[in-house]
Amino acid sequence: MNQWQLSYQSPVELTEHLRKSYWAYDAKEKSATKMAFDQDVNLIWVGDTYGRVSSYDPSYSLYTRHTAHIGAEPVVELLSHKQGVLSLGGESLNFANRRSVTKLHVTSADIAQLCDMRAMCYGSNSQNTVYCGGTNLASGLVAVDLVKGRLSNTVQYSSKVKLMQSSNRLMAVARQNGMLDLLDPNSNTVVKTFSGHSCMVSSMDFRDHTLVTAGKSKRFNMMYPDQFVNVYDLRIMKQLPPISFSKNTEYMGNGACYMVGADFVQLHPILPTVVVIGSVTGAFDFVDLSNPTVRTQYCHPCQSVTQLQLSPSGDYIAFIEHDNNINMWSRSNGMTGFTSTATTILEYPDYPDDGILAGATSIDDYSYPLSSVGLPYYNEKLLSAWHQTVFRSDGTIPMKVPLPPKSSAASSSHTALSTSSDSRPNTARSGNPSSGGQKYRLLPYDRHKYGHRNVAVPYRSLRERKKKLLITDEDGKDKQELMNYKPSNDREVPPAFTKLQMVYGRFGVQDFDFKAFNKTRYSGLETDIDNVYTNAVLQMYRFVPEVYNFLVSCLKMENFSDNSLLTELGSLYDMMVRANGEICRSSNFQEALASIPKSYLLGLITDSIDNALEPNTTVSGTSISDSDASGSSMTAKLESMVLGDDKTTISCHDNNDNSLTTPQKFNTFLLNRLLFEELQMKINTTQSIVLEELLGIDVQVTTRSISPCANFTRRSDIIPVLTVTSPISNNIKYVNKKLNNQTILPYIESSMSRLKHTKAMCEKCFKCETVESEKTVRNLPPLLSLNISLTSDEWATAKTVRGWLTKEFYATISKDRPILKLQPTDLKTTNAIFKYELNGYVARICDYITEPHLVAYSKIFDPTTRTYKWYMFNDFLVQEVDEEEALNISYWWKTPEIAIYSDAEELTKPFVPASFYTINYSILYRDHFANGMRESIKKEYRLLTAEEAPKPGSLVALDAEFVALSEDQVEISCKGTKTLIKPAKTALARVSVLRGEGDLAGVPFIDDYIVNTKHIEDYLTKYSGIEPGDLDPDTSSKPLVTRRVVLRKIWLLLQLGCIFVGHGLYNDFRNINIHVPKEQTRDTALYYLQGRRYLSLRYLAYALLDKDIQKGNHDSIEDAYTALVLYRKYLDLREKGIFETVLNRIYEEGRASNYRVPGDLQ
């Protein structure tokens, strides 16, 4: 492979089209992400970070460009097709011909599994099916039929996908952990797995029976490219000896010399034994696989390379450089173009002849196209381009066009068709005119639905907004502005409703001023967690008295399951009451939620609240809605729902969950899970199921066949959540009724009595007949949990009704059907009448700057004033609001999603604390290991005895150690300034608690290691003392317990009134996720002068106790004991009145040694 030379063509920048003035303030990266040669014509396809796909000819002249992915979604993969090009984004797949005309475009709205995609490849040489894979474990590998434009197949695949390639009958899938799988697309099974690279696969190529890969390994906490390229022979399914990259290629930088590894690898398309190996430094080799010593080396002159591609003819190599310029190498002779089989001729536009017309054209000649009349050139600004401030107009609203008269028969026929074919009207679902003969019509601009029109949104600096979250002015005006919850105009969202982001300072989260966002005694929740959207739902149920009392009462019993939402939610609510307005976290609850497999299948493990199941899709698992047609018992339904029993497949057309948002699906899943866990807890007792009595809605499902056989079935189900939809979609009788002046009551009442006609196969006569299905609620539980699922058009109508979300109503059961009215006098019945009041609701907030998020409203009884007050919870911002503002949903940016109505008597019940119940303390006096008792366990503690039972005020010394599950997320500005976006995710690894008083003072009675089977990024051995294998239940010799066991021990000590002594207890308790009041903590960080640095435990022990601790790795028992001795020293210095003098001396001496002990200086 000699005689290669750099092309004479001048490099061309590929991102020139992204450097527009209107993107000047866009911080999104503007770069080329993917490059591919066309297999049939002389074109190069390039995708960028804004979803554009461009094609260039051999002279780098632009041929076509089109937007393949909407919403500035980056292009992650390109594939050449015989009819055009395939482009893959994170949540969409685009297929366009070479003239940039879209032939197929599917998104996650069409195929729900199309989420977080990273790679794709063809399933066969026919190129009719393409397989896509990504990082979403619930999606697996998605096969899309390019001919029919729909989902063809789904392959179950439990690993995150990095790269995909196909050849002959197999597909090669590279995982993100460096492993390689060979997949048979005919049987959808993995036929072989190879251990590719230790960390990741960076490049891969697959041709005939040869597979080559280049990857990276981790050394010294850094990723370095491997020096060798792996080669696999798939005829014998074995790995061949690896091929080394250029041994004499080195890279000089920062005064050091580094060996260059392989970053790119590609097989030659013509010569089957030749492979091209390249590096980001520009070096590339041609190597003969049959004789690796035969190689030709070249080096591309540039700073770095981001993409390398070999043309189908094998005569060109294209490079994309670090500055997004494209450059090319070629052979000096025998060149045939990019492809040697060019059979397709490129099409170019036809240019009209602008010559003199043969003759004048009559103005009445309708056959003459107006598009052929040219426009004159202009050198002044057109009126249509003038700024909106010149006219100050919102634009002209088109007048309504009267519809032609339509017969009642046609109307009823169209209505019946729409109602029977779907649970929603056709126009509401698609926005297209219906097929019942209705004419097209112009609709007026809906300001309530779309907000203000034709108004330029002023630029607002996000950097200044972040500064306001961290820095408070002397007069506090910045924070006062952020607490404003009333809108100043109808265009902007009030500051209190914006999506909040925690800003980390020098000392992490301790610098954040949470108190400025909450002046109440009700705690907010941090946003530094996964699934942050759940905060609003948890806050709503926190202030439902009976739900709170039941969950907290469950803490009296032992439950050591790590996936118990019942226990974690009770602990969270107990912590929020104990915090009394201070910030809390729901991290333990999120850990339990993530440990339930069904939460992934439902898409609940996400920070986005936009994804919802779409119609015409199939979902595995038993339905979770009130229209489940499985006919199973309550226990079987709950087990299928929360445990992930996927034996049944139900179409979304059979339930009402096809339009539920992620928060609504989480609401349904949460209540079903809590019901299931309570049922499991009381399965061998005669106790009643409390949550079923509170939330259980008895739904009677009656199905009858409108045919001569008259088949009839009836069953009953218990559901905890009612999905509220429009009356028009629930019953035919509401079709001709207007809802302009109706509150939510007709929506609820019609959702409690649904009637639908469908075409189905009769189970008795086996004929396709019209089946009438009626679902009726037979009871009125004390709590009504509602998922409000309306279309955009239905919300536009509801927002115009004042008081649509009514604060109270009266209900009764009459003739086995619920009736809801605003006044009790409107209920003409002698049956019992129940009064319901709105307890709270969750609303979606949409603004111009950030993605949608949730806030919660709760109605709380104030015992001091004996009145109810409304509070708004926006994560850690808590604000009291007036009732009128809380119930106002007319704003375009606020839409209710979940609401809960409580019986008026339930709402007045008090919140009972955990201390009211008789608590089981036995775990403090015994062991409960995660994997049973073992003789090899090394115990360094002595259990408490009944005589040593802690009392209020008893001193205990505590220290906790953690391991890192992920690294810090840091943002680096153009000036080199680093900003911590999200700190590293940690996991509790070890907890040691020592006696603080008595004859055994300083002797530990708890020294538990917490079992961890997840991936650990860093054991932090130097600071935690945890070695690899210490937390593995199969290899560890430590006393391993589950996370819930150690949390209960600490919680019990807190309940007993113990005083905790330690160093840096704030961070320990925050990461453990438990709140301990300040009066129960004694932190040795009190050795601190205001405005000066904090002193480490090691330096304090040396300066005050003359002890050299932490010589090797940290030991939590030693650290807890040292903190206990330091606290006693503090009390002694306070008693003598010399504490301030000694503290000043410590700071003065420490300044000379930079606060280090002599051992550290050496």
Curated annotation (Swiss-Prot):
Q: Where is this region: Disordered?
A: 401-443
The reply on keyword Metal-binding is yes
Chain intervals for the UniProt region annotation (Linker): 341-491
The principal location of this protein is: cytoplasm
From the UniProt record, list the reaction(s) this protein catalyses.
Exonucleolytic cleavage of poly(A) to 5'-AMP
SUPFAM superfamilies xref list: Cysteine proteinases, Ribonuclease H-like, WD40 repeat-like
What is a single molecular function from GO for this protein? metal ion binding
Identify the Pfam families for this entry: PAN2_N, RNase_T, UCH_1
Give the UniProt keywords, A-Z: Cytoplasm, Exonuclease, Hydrolase, Metal-binding, mRNA processing, Nuclease, Repeat, WD repeat
Q: Which InterPro entries match?
A: Exonuclease_RNaseT/DNA_pol3 (IPR013520), PAN2 (IPR030843), PAN2-PAN3_catalytic_subunit (IPR050785), PAN2_N (IPR048841), PAN2_UCH_dom (IPR028881), Papain-like_cys_pep_sf (IPR038765), RNaseH-like_sf (IPR012337), RNaseH_sf (IPR036397)
Q: Does the keyword Metal-binding apply?
A: yes
Start and end residues of each USP domain: 492-904
Residues forming the Exonuclease domain are: 956-1126
Q: How is the cofactor bound?
A: Binds 2 metal cations per subunit in the catalytic exonuclease domain.
Q: Name one GO cellular component term.
A: PAN complex
List locations, semicolon-separated: Cytoplasm
Which amino acids does the record list as binding a divalent metal cation? 959, 961, 1068, 1119
Q: Which domain of life is it from?
A: Eukaryota
The residue ranges flagged as biased composition, category Low complexity, are 407-423
Query: What is written about domains in the entry's comments?
Result: Contains a pseudo-UCH domain. This ubiquitin C-terminal hydrolase (UCH)-like or ubiquitin specific protease (USP)-like domain is predicted to be catalytically inactive because it lacks the active site catalytic triad characteristic of thiol proteases, with residues at the equivalent structural positions that are incompatible with catalysis, and it cannot bind ubiquitin. It functions as a structural scaffold for intra- and intermolecular interactions in the complex. The linker, or PAN3 interaction domain (PID), between the WD40 repeats and the pseudo-UCH domain mediates interaction with PAN3.
Give the function comment from the record. Catalytic subunit of the poly(A)-nuclease (PAN) deadenylation complex, one of two cytoplasmic mRNA deadenylases involved in mRNA turnover. PAN specifically shortens poly(A) tails of RNA and the activity is stimulated by poly(A)-binding protein PAB1. PAN deadenylation is followed by rapid degradation of the shortened mRNA tails by the CCR4-NOT complex. Deadenylated mRNAs are then degraded by two alternative mechanisms, namely exosome-mediated 3'-5' exonucleolytic degradation, or deadenylation-dependent mRNA decaping and subsequent 5'-3' exonucleolytic degradation by XRN1.
Belongs to which family?
Belongs to the peptidase C19 family. PAN2 subfamily.
The protein's name is PAN2-PAN3 deadenylation complex catalytic subunit PAN2
Q: Which organism is it from?
A: Eremothecium gossypii (strain ATCC 10895 / CBS 109.51 / FGSC 9923 / NRRL Y-1056) (Yeast)
